[in-house]
Amino acid sequence: MRRAPRSRGPGLCSGGPALRSGGPALRARRPGRCRAVAAALLAGLLAGGCGLISGSAMTDTVRPGPKAGYPGRPLTGAQLTVTSKEFTEQIVLGQIMGLVFEAAGAHVIDKTSIQGSIGAREAVKSGTADAAYEYTGTGWITYLGHTKPVIDPQEQWRVVRAEDRKNGLVWLPPSKLNNTYALALNPANQKKLGVHTLSDVAALSHKDPGAVTLCVENEFATRNDGLPGMARAYGMQVPSGNVRKMTGGVVYTETKKGTCALGEVFTTDGRIKAMNLQVLADDKHFFPNYNAAPEINAASLKKYPAMAEVLAPVTRALNNTVAQELNRKVDVDGEDPHQVAKDWLLREGFIREG
């Protein structure tokens, strides 16, 4: 069974409307005035001691496992708070981070599942939380205000890390978990259409325009890093009548059924494997990189430098296959995010009971 949500107020402390957030589709990637205003509001609330979500102590009896990669318990005596956004993948990553800190000896407060798309970042910036997993593309495009993504994943991380230092944040090396956009289709349609890459789709759109039908979310249909930009980058010809707009969950089910030949997906979504959808290669590397990386409060890292050491092996082990499995266990099988994270860390040897 899933854990019941921890109690939180109806809005940002005062009872007003809470900032909206959602699944991976709402990772807050768009820069703009609204983002800046929301960030300022959240920073003020956090600085004033107004919590967006009540925290609770992690109470697992765990120690470093055989693959932890460090001696002893280097965080013994540390008091650390972990946070995350409120969609499944983020919550699981937050639980992973907290469990790793626990195993290394820290006393950990769990403030994962913060409402709003920028609340977790503001918590880390303000020192209300010490660390979170964040996405490099979100940092570059949304938080730092750039419009052109960096194609190379490592370079994307390096430029974000360098620029975000001014905000008192340190980005540790990223994982291979890249939660970005993709197009997918069911096996029958892949066999019928013979497409394996987005370039194949572009070629098909010229040869047989009626064959390229798309199920997408409303946002993807209008974003520059979504359908319009993808069509330009690949030279796709997709008539507006071939595009069906719907909510995220419906996109997956309709793509599985073959209502549309192709559907917009997120590369780490657990429903991809559960529904046996085939993801097409972005062979021109159009979609931005959204690699998950630890984002640490600089003062916290200076006080407890071992945070970097204990997170490194776990971060290196995270990839899209792992994320799809963990997300599926929560979203499809209904398992508890904390237990899913713990089971994975135990299985991989990063922590042990006791």
Predicted segment positions?
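C-terminal motif of bacterial Sec signal peptides marking the signal peptidase cleavage site
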Residues: 45-49
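Bacterial signal peptide processing site
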Residues: 51-54
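Immediate post-signal peptide segment of exported/extracytoplasmic ligand-binding proteins
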Residues: 56-81, 202-213, 350-354
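Short, well-ordered beta-strand elements
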Residues: 76-89, 107-112, 210-215
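Ligand-binding "clamshell"
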Residues: 143-172, 259, 271-284
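A conserved helix-loop-strand patch within extracytoplasmic ligand-binding domains
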Residues: 153-213, 316-320
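A bilobed periplasmic-binding-protein/Venus flytrap-type ligand-binding module shared by bacterial periplasmic
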Residues: 181-191, 291-304
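Ligand-binding pocket segment of bilobal, Venus flytrap-like solute-binding proteins
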Residues: 207-282
